[in-house]
């Protein structure tokens, strides 16, 4: 049971809470009533706004739509007026542009092309919208006239401004690749820049709007003519220069003229003078050697003066030959200045058929290089003017005349070489070697230039190379056979037993091959493998060339043996073979031939030395008929202090007389013989002098004091030293 006090307190607490709750409820009820009132007021305001907005919309929308329609109508009117103006302008194009078209594009290309664009648009409009309109025919006719005028202007610009490239500029262009000191590149300006830009614009217009390719034919015809004339002009330059000065130009002249190249000339291989002609010239001019010499100039003196690997010009240049060029074993009265003056004074400068061959060869080689450079330049020009898909075909047509001219000239060279082979004029055939070498060196550039041209165009150079390789191989083979089969003719044999012309010519020919080892090897290899020169190794071709040279030397040796039998005197035959073998050996050693021969014949040098010694021994046997008279083994035995019988005195007389007569006869005969090599001549004299002096000295010592005659001076005609002096005068026509 709760106490009364706690119950009373709890009741008061509950009553207070109830009173608070009632107050809260009353507040909430008042707030709700206010909210309802506000909501009603807002709904009333919104309803009024909506009503007013609808009234406004109903009044504005019709006005807006009406304004929009008016704007559309205005735009349509403006477009219609613009279209009318545009259409009307097409009807005025003919009259507006006729004067410009009639006057042509010269000097006003930009304006002219603008007029042509207007005419083109007018044509397109009338074709699409009024194909039966007379205006269409009018503007089409005007368009055709304008196009023809542009084509004519294109032709005129190309014709007036396309100039032949001067030979001097071409030579500078060719020299540019080899001149390491060149400070700037040589460039060709085929057309002035302003003209080039006009030509490019016209060509592009004709391609895009003219739909006409005739201008491409005009282009290649004009440029083809200039290319061909440029190359022919270079060739004529060589001919004129050679006829006036003997050389195309001279960079040594300090005062540069307009016709003087600005760069050093490119060294190009010339041809080789014929040994036969030179030998004939020297003999005619009386250039006899000194002691023991002959009319034959030593081979070393005839070699081109350019170093190995260089490119020889004329076959002999007197100004280039010096004492160092002549073998120590050949002593000759060879004075460069006097020789040159003697030849020029008596016969004029050497400018005969062989000089012309040099000029033709050098000119052709330069023309080949010029073609490559000019063709490259032409393609660069063509690439700016001709559309890309027409460039290769146009370029092919452009280069045909010049290329055909070069190929025809090359075939003529092959034909001339073929005729020279028939005549056994093998030195003339050597013109093929420098040309073939240059063609093969230039072939990569050729292939690059001709890339994209027709197959027939690309195959022209390989065909010419094959022809030259074939004719060169035939020349080499026929030369070897000719050396072997050269007839033995007494009138053609040297009376003094010196070097035969066949030997000097053969060695000279082989030495000329040293400058063209790779080319000659390619010729031989092409026949060996029946394929192009690209399918063999350089070592293989070197062995083939070595084998060939050994074959020629073998044929030469056999022929010399045969020729030596023409001599009735075995001693002269031995001297002849000795001179020729010694000449061959010295020539091989002087040049690089000995190394080339050693590729396949290691013992060649030793073999020639053995042959030389054999001939010396054969020659020495000719003195046996002299020394046998006084040889110890053939002398009778005499008792010292015993008086000689008549028979014994007669034997001694016969010995002295036989020796004297034999000595005089041999000295008289052999005095006219020749051993051009000073070293060999002195060696043979000394050896023979030693043998004869020792034998004669012993004989004289034994019988000189014997009273075998009342007139000893009749039989003892020579002292020992006198005999030596007589032998010293052997092989000396001046003694």
From Swiss-Prot:
Region described as Disordered: spans on this chain: 239-268
Keyword vocabulary terms for this entry: Cell membrane, Coiled coil, Cytoplasm, Epilepsy, Exocytosis, Membrane, Phosphoprotein, Protein transport, Transport
Gene Ontology molecular function, alphabetical: phosphatidylinositol-4,5-bisphosphate binding; protein-macromolecule adaptor activity
Family of the protein in this entry: Belongs to the EXO70 family.
Tissue expression notes: Abundant in the ventricular zone, the outer subventricular zone and the cortical plate of the fetal cortex.
Family annotation (PANTHER family): EXOCYST COMPLEX COMPONENT 7, EXOCYST COMPLEX PROTEIN EXO70
Chain's role: Component of the exocyst complex involved in the docking of exocytic vesicles with fusion sites on the plasma membrane. In adipocytes, plays a crucial role in targeting SLC2A4 vesicle to the plasma membrane in response to insulin, perhaps directing the vesicle to the precise site of fusion. It is required for neuron survival and plays an essential role in cortical development.
One GO cellular component term: growth cone membrane
Quaternary structure annotation from Swiss-Prot or TrEMBL: The exocyst complex is composed of EXOC1, EXOC2, EXOC3, EXOC4, EXOC5, EXOC6, EXOC7 and EXOC8. Interacts with ARHQ in a GTP-dependent manner. Interacts with RAB11FIP3.
Domain notes: The N-terminus is involved in SEC8 and ARHQ binding. The C-terminus is required for translocation to the plasma membrane.
Chief place of localization: cytoplasm
Domain of life, per lineage: Eukaryota
Pfam family, one: Exo70_C
GO BP terms in the entry: exocytosis; membrane fission; mitotic cytokinesis; positive regulation of mitotic cytokinetic process; protein transmembrane transport; regulation of entry of bacterium into host cell; regulation of macroautophagy; vesicle docking involved in exocytosis
Implicated disorder: Neurodevelopmental disorder with seizures and brain atrophy: An autosomal recessive disorder characterized by brain atrophy, seizures, and developmental delay. Disease severity is variable. Severely affected individuals develop symptoms in utero, which may lead to spontaneous abortion. Patients at the mildest end of the phenotypic spectrum have onset of seizures later in childhood and show developmental delay with mildly impaired intellectual development and minimal brain atrophy.
Membrane topology, from the record: Peripheral membrane protein
Protein name: Exocyst complex component 7
Coiled coil: 5-42, 63-85
Subcellular location per the Swiss-Prot or TrEMBL entry: Cytoplasm, Cytosol; Cell membrane; Midbody, Midbody ring
Residues modified as Phosphoserine: 133
